[in-house]
Every structure is written in structure tokens, then in C-alpha cells.
């Protein structure tokens, strides 16, 4: 019998801005840890709901929360803390995590969201249990010393039809503790092209985290 899942949505206040979120939780028992899902420029938290990722994570025992980034989705009215393509202060995602009371989450970060996740990942004292970059932008804006200082285990994901995935991997492979999932025949949003492979790879990675 499939485990029950509770789903809800709402808004949080982050640095004076209202941000929309969707959440899925295990219907019973304590969640193992939290997973924060970010998104690309043409997407939103709805992507993760429609794909079934929120549901699959909650079924597997995780608290899964997807936010709509500032200026996008249902957070359209919120002003972004940095122009698109520039690194946002790491304090922005730290404030999101605090507002949602996530504890240190695993962060899933496709495409545009790299401008938020990479400064958060590499901030001094950052202790994320896991990081799943999916061809994120801004990988060239983090220096080698900052990559080398990251203790967080990473699952680097990209489609082999995505030139940006290969480019970002050239930088992300400097993360000391990483493994790679390359999806054959998949493009930039590789999780949409190969949802089963995405979910299997993601859940397998999470299972191995402490």
C-alpha cells in the first residue's frame, strides 16, 4: 500500500517579499529531512507538483517544499535580490529556509536557480546534507577555493543533449564529493524528458545521505 501524503500551499515572507510555496509531507511519522526544490526561468513550483516529484519525495519519507522564485510563478510580485544571471546573496535562501523552518535541506537547483543556490551552498559555515544541481547557471562565478571548501555531497544531473549541462559540469566537478547522472537523449529540463530516471536517481542519492 502506498504511503499517504499530505499536501499544502501557502506564502512566506522573505526579506519583506511574499513568496509562494507548495509542500508535500509524509502522512504519518517523522520526515527524514527536508528537500527544497527550486526551478528554472520558464518553470515554477507547479513543475515539481505536475511531474510528481513532490509526491514521490513525501512518499519516500521526506518533507518536500518547492518555492516560486521572486518575479516568477505565483511570486511574480516579489522583487529578486539580484538581476538574472548574477549571484544573489547566500542570505536570501538562508532566509527562505528559516521562514519554512526546513532545517538544513537538500537543495535541488535547476538552471536559473543556480544564481540562488550556489552562493548558499558555498557560504561560510553552510552545512547542507545534499545538493542536486541540474545544469544550473552561474557555475563560472564561483571560484575554485569556494568549490573546494564544500563538504556537501552533490548529485550533478544533466541531459547529454544540453550544452549548458556540460558547461556547468566543467565547473561543478570541482565539488570534492560528487557523483554524476547524465541522462541520455535528454535536453536542458532533463527531469521532464526522463521523469522515471530522474526520480530513481534522485531517490537513490537521497537514500545514501545521512
UniProtKB/Swiss-Prot annotation:
Pfam families: Abhydrolase_6. The keyword Zinc-finger does not apply. Signal peptide: none annotated. GO terms for cellular component: cytoplasm; cytosol; extracellular exosome; nucleolus; nucleoplasm; nucleus. It catalyses: L-lysyl-[protein] + acetyl-CoA = N(6)-acetyl-L-lysyl-[protein] + CoA + H(+). The keyword Acetylation applies. It is an enzyme of class 2 (transferase). Its EC number is 2.3.1.-. The active site is at residues 111, 162, 188. Changing residue 111 to A: Abolished protein-lysine deacetylase activity in vitro. The modification Phosphoserine is found at residue 91. Keywords: Acetylation, Acyltransferase, Cytoplasm, Nucleus, Phosphoprotein, Transferase. One of its GO terms (molecular function) is hydrolase activity. InterPro entries: AB_hydrolase_1 (IPR000073), AB_hydrolase_fold (IPR029058). Acts as an atypical protein-lysine deacetylase in vitro. Catalyzes the deacetylation of lysine residues using CoA as substrate, generating acetyl-CoA and the free amine of protein-lysine residues. Additional experiments are however required to confirm the protein-lysine deacetylase activity in vivo. Has hydrolase activity towards various surrogate p-nitrophenyl (pNp) substrates, such as pNp-butyrate, pNp-acetate and pNp-octanoate in vitro, with a strong preference for pNp-acetate. May activate transcription. This is Putative protein-lysine deacylase ABHD14B. It comes from Homo sapiens.
